[in-house]
Regions:
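C-terminal recognition in membrane/secretory proteostasis and scaffolding
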Residues: 1-188
């Protein structure tokens, strides 16, 4: 979400009625929050779009980050009803609250003098990718010799998909010593 002034929100489709309601409830407020980006394949990807104007969460007007963060922090593992306006239409969506700690790297694997961990939410957001794959923090000897650069995301080894660090570990443990294998990755 990013803050946007009312003048820009009207161009995005905020109705006059909603603007009047927000201005009456929060006279000092100069705008609302807008969806800037949605992580591909996330739980919200099918419900929210960039440009959606956030109006309410669980029936309460939300105009700033702090109240939004408080509601979301208290909604981990629960559903929340989010009301947005898109192109002049009010839409209500039920979204599942996620714990950011669950999609933040908390372990790593050292392999062939390299360092690998799961792709973090922050990196996925920055790269506009699903939170899937393994991040190459340091390619080390094995991946460096294969010219796989630091900052790449490993998505597969051989015929196997790599969705997370557990997949990566399982696959590399099964590889015989000195065996070469195809690695699918993306780099930015």
């Amino acid at each position: 979400f990013v803050p946007k002034p009312f003048a820009e929100l009207r161009r995005l489709g905020l109705t006059r009625e909603t603007e009047a309601r927000v201005r009456a409830a929060y006279p000092q407020q100069t705008g609302l929050l807008v969806v800037e980006q949605v992580i591909p394949e996330s739980k919200a990807a099918s419900d929210l779009e960039p440009g959606d104007v956030l109006v309410e969460v669980d029936g309460k007007l939300i105009a700033e980050f702090v109240p939004l963060a408080a509601v979301l922090d208290n909604s981990v593992g629960k559903e929340v009803t989010v009301a947005v306006e898109r192109g002049g239409q009010r839409l209500e969506r039920r979204l599942q609250g996620d714990n950011l700690n669950d999609i933040t790297p908390d372990e790593y694997i050292e392999y062939g003098d390299g360092v690998f961990h799961k792709l973090s939410y922050q990196q996925a957001r920055h790269l506009y990718r699903p939170v899937s794959g393994v991040y190459v923090a340091n390619p080390g000897y094995v991946f460096g010799k294969a010219a796989i650069p630091r900052g790449s995301i490993v998505t597969g080894i051989g015929a196997e998909d790599v969705k997370d660090l557990d997949d990566f570990e399982r696959i590399i443990e099964m590889l015989p010593d000195q065996q070469q294998e195809t690695v699918r990755y993306v780099s930015f």
